[in-house]
A protein has these predicted regions:
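Outer-membrane beta-barrel biogenesis signature
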Residues: 4-34, 103-105
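Short glycine/proline- and aromatic-enriched beta-strand/turn motifs that initiate or cap beta-hairpins
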Residues: 19-60, 64-71, 76, 125, ...
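Residues that define the transmembrane beta-barrel architecture of outer-membrane proteins
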Residues: 29-31, 48-54, 91-97, 138-144, ...
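Membrane-embedded beta-strand positions of outer-membrane beta-barrel proteins
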Residues: 33-35, 70, 99, 113-117, ...
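Outer-membrane beta-barrel translocator domains and adjoining extracellular loop/strand segments
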Residues: 44-52, 79-91, 124-136, 140, ...
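Structural signature of outer-membrane beta-barrel channels/translocons
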Residues: 59-61, 102-106, 122, 151-153, ...
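Repeated loop/turn-to-beta-strand initiation elements of outer-membrane beta-barrel proteins
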Residues: 65-68, 109-111, 152, 157-160
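Predominantly the C-terminal beta-signal and adjacent terminal strand-loop region
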Residues: 77-82, 149, 154-202
Length: 202
């Protein structure tokens, strides 16, 4: 019986050790998916706000250190309030599509650092309602962003990912004749711009 237990323990240890030494990280030819899914609800006074976000991304390693990819996104944001028995609401639906390139340092290790350059195009529709009266407006825009990030592999296929936006340029223009675009440029470390996600490599 003891021999069986010892043999089982050795087999278990060997399996764990093999799993630990199994290749982790990224290599040329690897494909990965990542992204964000979230829902947030907040009430401030009489105003109730809901936000739903889904933004998947897929990338492919064209070399040992460079990955190219594409992403899509959808955000629904709604604010509701009641004033003088009239229900007011402000809803924004945003659709986005973009591409990105990443350069990885130490890509074939459990822990890696990368820099990402991304460009995105977005279309937003804003619907404002006051009782039975409704007004729609649309806007188009794009942005270019530079962000450093890190990956930590929990297993050969799953990793945690964090990115921090430090440089961002955006331009938004209402979808009406004669509209003027609003440009914005920002640089700096802002902890509010940290994005966390889960990566699946296959």
């Amino acid at each position: 019986m003891k021999k069986v237990l010892v043999a089982s323990a050795i087999a278990l240890f060997a399996g764990m050790n093999a799993q630990e030494t199994e290749t982790v990280g990224f290599n040329m030819g690897d494909t990965f998916i990542t992204g964000a899914v979230g829902f947030n609800s907040q009430t401030t006074g009489d105003v109730k706000s809901n936000t739903f976000t889904i933004a998947p991304s897929v990338g492919y390693f064209v070399t040992s250190n460079v990955a190219l990819g594409a992403r899509v996104g959808y955000i629904n944001s709604t604010d509701k309030n009641t004033v003088a028995n009239v229900e007011l609401s402000n809803e924004v639906n945003t659709f986005a599509i973009g591409a990105f390139g990443r350069y990885y340092w130490m890509p074939a290790s459990r822990f890696s650092i990368f820099g990402e350059l991304a460009a995105n195009y977005a279309n937003a529709k804003n619907t404002v309602k006051a009782g039975s009266i409704s007004t729609d407006s649309k806007a188009n825009g794009f942005n270019i962003a530079l962000a450093p990030g890190i990956n930590y592999f929990l297993s050969p296929n799953f990793a945690l990912e964090a990115t921090l936006g430090i440089v961002n340029y955006s331009s938004v223009k209402p979808d009406v004749d004669g509209a003027i675009a609003t440009d914005n440029f920002g640089i700096g470390l802002d902890l509010n711009n940290i994005s966390l996600g889960l990566v699946y490599k296959f």
